[in-house]
Amino acid sequence: MARVVRIFKTLRNHWKKSTVGFCLLAYGSHWLYGKHCDNLLRRAACEEAQVFGNHQILPHSAIKKATVFLNPAACKGKARTLFEKNAAPVLHLAGIDITVVKTDYEGQAKKLLELMEKTDLIIVAGGDGTVQEVITGLLRRDDEASFSKIPIGFIPLGGTNTLSHTLYPERENKVEQITEATLSILKGETVPLDVLQIKGEQDQPVFAVQGIRWGSYRDASVKVSKYWYLGPLKARAAHLFSALKEWPQQHQASISYLGPAERPPEEPEQKPSRPPLYVRIYRRLALYWSPPKVEVPVEPTPEPWEEAQLSAVELSITTQNHQPDLLRTLDSMSIHIEPDTISKGKFIQLGAQKMTDPLLHPEDSQVLLASRCSLHLPQGTEGHFSIDSEEYEAMSVDVTLLPRKLHFLCHPTRKQELLQSPTATAQS
């Protein structure tokens, strides 16, 4: 008893040291508990993956091959460690023959995709920029018609993982997010996503699954990291200094666009069986003896292009992938024109909100739906675009919607939500 009293006296006499020690002990306990929970998540994911690996392979069947494009520089250089600790063991236990391709510099994934051999599965381990590079390299291939049918998996390892909100349920824990995404790849459920083809006057086309941004909010967002010392106020500070440097901020251009297009019928997944020999012979003879058909020339109907002059604080052209509707009958991309009549205070407030939700737009924005559009910038225009969070020089571009071009692997529950009506999907 005397010893306990002596301990309490010591803590009372040295209360400053005791407080610091208690805080360190509490933080250390919380850190160790977090590590323990992460290990439990990894173990559960590996046990679930082993169920896939225990399935017997039929005779003369090949092992499923997957090519992983890993960006080690993503997530401030932590992507490689995150992949090797959380995703790689799950893929190995599932019995998949994986080939990991690590990119060393920006743009390398585009070149590697042009040389890639046939694979059963493509996995992108990185962020928005890595996804943009991989799909650009994939769709630039001469045989892109066949390679674009390969399912694509996405493991969110980057600083910005916009696509993960579409493919997987929201998760706060990073380890749980990665392991759940990897397990979703093994389950094989896919969702078709639209792609934007962005073509300049001379350059090769660039492809995006999210969209293109041009304007003041984009310019201010790339400078937020300069004000890291302001902590949670850094986003507001970047937009404040942007407003003080130049106001009003106007981006003028002209845009011509073609309205939404009818969704073509889906191609059957299984090819129809070949008809019997006598049916094929009869068809050939009927075709041979039938008189030649006279083709009546049909004049092509002019496409109803519309034009508009814009003066905006920001322009964005985005796909519908943030909330895809698998039951829609019209295919379109969204063109958001945000008015330049906004006040400085509203500009700073909305800019800070856009850092967490880039798809946020003011209520008075003009929204156009189009299947194709041409953006014409005035000669001498400076600045940059953001295409799926990657920076490109601003120039006049033609943007074409490629509906349901690529198939991404997703979580089964997300697939069920997307197959419901739009109202039910929005409420979930």
From Swiss-Prot:
Its main location: mitochondrion. Its EC number is 2.7.1.107, 2.7.1.138, 2.7.1.94. One of its GO terms (cellular component) is cytoplasm. Keywords: ATP-binding, Kinase, Lipid metabolism, Membrane, Mitochondrion, Mitochondrion inner membrane, Nucleotide-binding, Transferase. GO terms for molecular function: acylglycerol kinase activity; ATP binding; ATP-dependent diacylglycerol kinase activity; ceramide kinase activity; D-erythro-sphingosine kinase activity. Belongs to the AGK family. Lipid kinase that can phosphorylate both monoacylglycerol and diacylglycerol to form lysophosphatidic acid (LPA) and phosphatidic acid (PA), respectively. Phosphorylates ceramide but not sphingosine. Phosphorylates 1,2-dioleoylglycerol more rapidly than 2,3-dioleoylglycerol. Independently of its lipid kinase activity, acts as a component of the TIM22 complex. The TIM22 complex mediates the import and insertion of multi-pass transmembrane proteins into the mitochondrial inner membrane by forming a twin-pore translocase that uses the membrane potential as the external driving force. This is Acylglycerol kinase, mitochondrial. It comes from Xenopus laevis (African clawed frog). The lineage of its organism: Eukaryota, Metazoa, Chordata, Craniata, Vertebrata.
